[in-house]
C-alpha cells in the first residue's frame, strides 16, 4: 500500500477568507455535512486556534492531531505535535493502520500554508460571498491542479450562501 496522501479540507469565500475571530464567518449546514463525510475515520491535522474553535472537541470518529508549540497545551483526546512533519508521520501511520488512503489537514491559515506544497488533493468549498475576516486560505495556483469533482449548492435553509464543492488533485 502506498503512503496515505495529504489532503487539505477548506472552505473559503471569494475574497479568500476562511475565518473571523476564531470562527467560520458563515453558516453552511450542507458544507458541514460534506466536511464530516470527507474527514470521518481519517486523521485530521489542525492548528491550536482551529482546535479551540471547534464547538465539540475532539471531532468524533477521527484521530485529532493538533499542532502547537506551547509546552503546557495538553488537550484531552488529541495528539499534540510541535511540527507538521511529526503530525504527518503520526497521522499517516494511523491512517495506514486503519486502511485509510489520506490524512486531512483542516486549518488554519499557517497550517494550510505549511501543508499546501505537500498536498496531493484539495477538498475546497468555494463560498459565493465576500465576507470580512482575519484568516485567509493561501494563494492557490489553479494551473497546478485538476478538478475531478464539482457540486453546486444553492443558498437555502441552513445555508447562508450558495457554494461550490470542488475536489482538486495535483497535476
Describe the role of every protein-language-model region.
Residues 2-171:
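Enzymes that bind and transform nitrogen-containing heteroaromatic metabolites
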Amino acid at each position: 500500500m502506498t503512503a496515505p496522501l495529504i489532503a487539505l479540507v477548506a472552505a473559503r469565500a471569494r475574497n479568500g477568507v476562511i475565518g473571523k475571530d476564531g470562527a467560520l464567518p458563515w453558516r453552511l449546514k450542507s458544507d458541514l455535512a460534506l466536511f464530516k463525510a470527507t474527514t470521518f475515520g481519517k486523521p485530521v491535522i489542525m492548528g491550536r486556534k482551529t482546535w479551540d474553535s471547534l464547538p465539540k472537541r475532539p471531532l468524533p470518529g477521527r484521530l485529532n492531531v493538533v499542532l502547537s508549540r506551547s509546552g503546557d497545551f495538553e488537550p484531552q483526546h488529541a495528539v499534540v505535535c510541535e511540527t507538521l512533519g511529526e503530525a504527518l508521520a503520526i497521522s499517516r501511520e494511523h491512517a495506514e493502520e486503519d486502511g485509510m488512503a489520506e490524512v486531512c489537514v483542516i486549518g488554519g491559515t499557517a497550517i494550510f500554508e505549511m501543508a499546501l506544497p505537500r498536498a496531493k488533493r484539495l477538498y475546497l468549498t468555494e463560498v459565493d460571498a465576500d465576507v470580512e475576516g482575519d484568516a485567509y486560505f493561501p494563494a492557490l495556483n489553479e494551473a497546478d491542479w485538476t478538478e475531478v469533482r464539482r457540486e453546486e449548492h444553492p443558498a437555502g435553509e441552513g445555508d447562508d450562501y450558495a457554494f461550490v464543492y470542488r475536489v482538486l488533485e495535483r497535476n
